[in-house]
Amino acid sequence: MKNQLRGPPVRAHMSTSGAAAAAAAGGTRAGSEPGAGSGSGAGIGAGATTGAGAMPCKSAEWLQEELEARGGASLLLLDCRPHELFESSHIETAINLAIPGLMLRRLRKGNLPIRSIIPNHADKERFATRCKAATVLLYDEATAEWQPEPGAPASVLGLLLQKLRDDGCQAYYLQGGFNKFQTEYSEHCETNVDSSSSPSGSPPTSVLGLGGLRISSDCSDGESDRELPSSATESDGSPVPSSQPAFPVQILPYLYLGCAKDSTNLDVLGKYGIKYILNVTPNLPNAFEHGGEFTYKQIPISDHWSQNLSQFFPEAISFIDEARSKKCGVLVHCLAGISRSVTVTVAYLMQKMNLSLNDAYDFVKRKKSNISPNFNFMGQLLDFERTLGLSSPCDNHAPSEQLYFSTPTNHNLFPINTLEST
């Protein structure tokens, strides 16, 4: 059970330049445009740019005054940090923006509405009704001063800010980000205390958040977009994280996600009641295939950008459902348990739980933190999402876009609580 705590007021001494910016910001209210400040400080503070070409920002002091004077009623706060950091602590009333890395290019091209990357339905509606009427303030972890450089990759914070302003919103970024605001005004920050959180007390990291990601304009196959340790690799080229769970991870009561080692451990298979094994590799043997105790299915796919894994989604989903109907556990594995088997597992959750790609991916990642499907597989999952009709209604796509998989049947959709209690 999570309890929301508000920290005691904490004040930190500001630098001379920071104090000047805050002082200039003090008289600038929500909705003011760049340069709207008064006196000698105009053009420096929260409602103004910090120089030619700089993006418009608001100060921590300005935000504190808005929250205390109006309770944030005239403000729409957007937190662009990873979801785990948002869950750990965030500014009151903020909405978190979380998105799989594959969607960043779509965001850059302008065909991904911002509303569609807000996971919570109530927050979607709040964004839709207030984004044009309120001052929109975005923040990341610690951006202090930001001036775009010509030709440099746009940060996601900058991309969102520019898109909002192009759409007619009064949008700004928070100078100094969350770190500065929490240091100076912790009473306006909400912290979730959860006994199951990181034992070290440090916030976990995520590959899904927007804050530190950058978007390249190249047309690479996506392999370079995977940020994994380089100390080890799969036999067919996929990086393998240095630390992995010792046993398969339970995704649903009957569905387990693991690696090749798990599939050869009789003690593990027996412990979890696993009788069905889905092997998502072209060359790893089915260790106990001839013993008659286990039911196998093998999907001959390598972890490579050229492979079409999505054509096997229907039969993989059917195989998992067969195990479920017989009240048996099913293990989905590849070599390392981070790419191919994850892709199949996410596809299953999307169809059977009626989850969007973003929600299904997040669901799996919360159970197994080291997942990293290759970029092409994520693209296939995105196409699968469209076929299932799970995309946001405001996320329109050109009719000429190609789908790269056999269309699965869209039936037998189960609510989350039904599947998790089975």
UniProtKB/Swiss-Prot annotation:
At the top of the EC hierarchy, this enzyme's class is: hydrolase
InterPro entries per the record? Dual-sp_phosphatase_cat-dom (IPR000340), MKP (IPR008343), Prot-tyrosine_phosphatase-like (IPR029021), Rhodanese-like_dom (IPR001763), Rhodanese-like_dom_sf (IPR036873), Tyr_Pase_dom (IPR000387), TYR_PHOSPHATASE_DUAL_dom (IPR020422)
State the Pfam families in the record: DSPc (PF00782), Rhodanese (PF00581)
Q: Which residues form the Rhodanese domain?
A: 71-190
Subcellular locations according to the entry = Cytoplasm
Q: Known catalysed reaction(s)?
A: O-phospho-L-tyrosyl-[protein] + H2O = L-tyrosyl-[protein] + phosphate; O-phospho-L-seryl-[protein] + H2O = L-seryl-[protein] + phosphate; O-phospho-L-threonyl-[protein] + H2O = L-threonyl-[protein] + phosphate
Q: Where is this region: Disordered?
A: 1-43, 219-243
Q: Say which domain of life the source belongs to.
A: Eukaryota
Q: Quote the biased-composition stretches of kind Polar residues, using this chain's numbering.
A: 230-243
Main location, first listed in the record = cytoplasm
EC no.? 3.1.3.16, 3.1.3.48
Residues bound to substrate are 334-340
Described by its record, this protein's role is as follows: Dual specificity protein phosphatase. Shows high activity towards MAPK1/ERK2. Also has lower activity towards MAPK14 and MAPK8. In arrested oocytes, plays a role in meiotic resumption. Promotes nuclear envelope breakdown and activation of the CDK1/Cyclin-B complex in oocytes, probably by dephosphorylating and inactivating the conventional protein kinase C (cPKC) isozyme PRKCB. May also inactivate PRKCA and/or PRKCG.
Say which family it is in: Belongs to the protein-tyrosine phosphatase family. Non-receptor class dual specificity subfamily.
Binding partners and assembly? Interacts with MAPK1/ERK2; the interaction enhances DUSP7 phosphatase activity.
Q: What is this protein called?
A: Dual specificity protein phosphatase 7
Which organism's genome codes for this protein? Mus musculus (Mouse)
Q: What gene name is listed for this protein?
A: Dusp7
